[in-house]
Structures are given as C-alpha cells and as structure tokens.
C-alpha cells in the first residue's frame, strides 16, 4: 500500500477557532479524519503531522524520504519566508504538493509569494479543506496511481 504524509505547519492546530472567516469552522482533527477516509477509499495509507516549529517540520520532511511516496504540505506562514523548509523539500526525492486553505494570492501582499512552491510538484490554493483532497488526487496522479 502506498503511504502519503500530510504535514501541516504553524497555527493550523487552531483551525476552527482562528480566523474562521478565512479558514472556515472545520478543525484540524476533522481535516485529518476526512483525509484518512479519502485515502483509505483510494487504497492509500495516510499519516498526519502538525507542528508550530520550523525544525520539527524540516526533520519530518527529511525523515519522510524513503518511507512515504509523497507529502501533502501546508507550510502555513513558513510558505512566505522559510528557505530552510524550501531546502528540506529540495533535498528529498519524493514529490511534495503544497496546499493552502485560502487563496494566498488574494490576501495580504506579504502572503502572495511562496518560497517553497518552486521546489514542490505543484501548489493548490483557495479551495478550503477540499484543496487537501485535490492535493491527494494530484499526488496520486503524479505517482501514476490515479
């Protein structure tokens, strides 16, 4: 069975209470449960990780190489300035799909740039929690499983 890692970065543990007008009322637990169910329907194992700490995200990305077939990553605010996470993504051999709940290109100007997108297989933004499912579908297509 193929295995995929879902990684959520800083403040995503606050989903459902943080800026619900931007991110919706769904919680991280709901998102992870829904994604595990979707992956199971597709015959894929999915494990989840969330951290507010850059180093923990980097370590998790490094450790995923060779264990998982790919990563779905929402780097949160690190998207816009973490060259360390960008380098971690570039250093692994498995594809990474970057996902954002909101459309980062319609928000504050500092959110318009993603330093991580250029080293990802693709980027999905603005579709709420459904964007994570789109990322899973895209990742499986990239892996030749769809």
Swiss-Prot record:
Pathway, per record: Metabolic intermediate biosynthesis; chorismate biosynthesis; chorismate from D-erythrose 4-phosphate and phosphoenolpyruvate: step 3/7
Its EC number(s): 4.2.1.10
Reaction equations catalysed: 3-dehydroquinate = 3-dehydroshikimate + H2O
Keywords: Amino-acid biosynthesis, Aromatic amino acid biosynthesis, Lyase
Binding of substrate, residues: 74, 80, 87, 101-102, 111
A UniProt-annotated Pfam family: DHquinase_II
Active-site residues per Swiss-Prot or TrEMBL entry: 23 (proton acceptor), 100 (proton donor)
One GO process term, biological-process aspect: amino acid biosynthetic process
Top-level taxon of origin: Bacteria
Site (Transition state stabilizer): 18
Record-level Gene Ontology MF annotations: 3-dehydroquinate dehydratase activity
Presence of the UniProt keyword Ribonucleoprotein in the record: no
CDD domains in the record: DHQase_II
Subunit structure: Homododecamer.
Name of the protein described by the UniProt record: 3-dehydroquinate dehydratase
Organism name: Bacillus cytotoxicus (strain DSM 22905 / CIP 110041 / 391-98 / NVH 391-98)
Lineage: Bacteria, Bacillati, Bacillota, Bacilli, Bacillales
Gene: aroQ
